[in-house]
C-alpha cells in the first residue's frame, strides 16, 4: 500500500521523496507569526513577490494545492492525514526537481481511527486548517479573504 501510494503521488503530483531540500515549512509552522513573516519575506526576496499581499496570495495557492493532494490521498488511498502536518518545500539546486514551485509531503499513515471523509474535509482540513490560515494571511494589506479562498478553491476544484 505504502509503495503504491508513494509511486502514485510522486508520478502524478509534486510530491516529495528523497530530494535535497533547501527550505521546508509545515502548515503548522505558518500559525507562528515570526515564521509566517519570514515565509512571506522569503517569497518576496527569493521568488520576486512584489508585495506581502502577493506573497500571501501565493501561499494560499500553495495551501490549495496541498489540500488537493491530501484529499486525493485520503480518497484514493485511505491515508489518515492531519492537514497541519503537511509540508511544502523548496528543493535545492542540486535536486532533480529544482523549480520555483514547491514540492509537497505529509506523513503517510493508513492505520488508526478513520473519520468519515466529508467530516474530515469539513472539520480538520477546512475549519481547523484553511480558515484560520486565511484569517492570518488576510491581515496583509491589499489582499482579501475572498481572493485567498478563491486561490485555495481553484486548486481544490482542479
What do the PLM-derived regions correspond to, one by one?
Residues 1-58:
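Generic N-terminal leader/targeting and pre-domain segments
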Residues 33-158:
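Hydrophobic, aromatic-lined core segments that form the binding pocket/scaffold
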Amino acid at each position: 500500500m505504502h509503495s503504491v501510494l508513494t509511486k502514485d503521488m510522486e508520478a502524478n503530483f509534486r510530491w516529495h521523496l528523497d530530494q535535497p531540500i533547501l527550505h521546508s515549512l509545515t502548515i503548522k509552522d505558518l500559525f507562528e507569526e515570526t515564521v509566517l513573516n519570514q515565509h512571506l519575506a522569503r517569497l518576496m526576496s527569493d521568488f520576486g513577490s512584489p508585495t506581502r499581499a502577493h506573497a500571501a496570495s501565493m501561499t494560499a495557492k500553495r495551501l490549495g494545492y496541498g489540500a488537493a493532494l491530501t484529499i486525493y490521498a485520503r480518497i484514493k488511498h485511505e491515508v489518515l492525514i492531519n492537514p497541519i502536518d503537511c509540508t511544502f518545500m523548496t528543493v535545492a539546486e542540486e535536486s532533480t526537481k529544482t523549480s520555483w514551485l514547491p514540492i509537497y509531503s505529509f506523513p503517510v499513515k493508513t492505520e488508526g481511527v478513520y473519520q468519515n471523509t466529508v467530516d474530515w474535509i469539513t472539520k480538520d482540513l477546512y475549519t481547523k486548517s484553511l480558515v484560520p490560515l486565511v484569517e492570518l494571511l488576510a491581515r496583509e494589506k491589499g489582499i482579501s479573504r475572498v481572493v485567498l479562498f478563491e486561490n485555495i478553491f481553484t486548486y481544490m476544484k482542479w
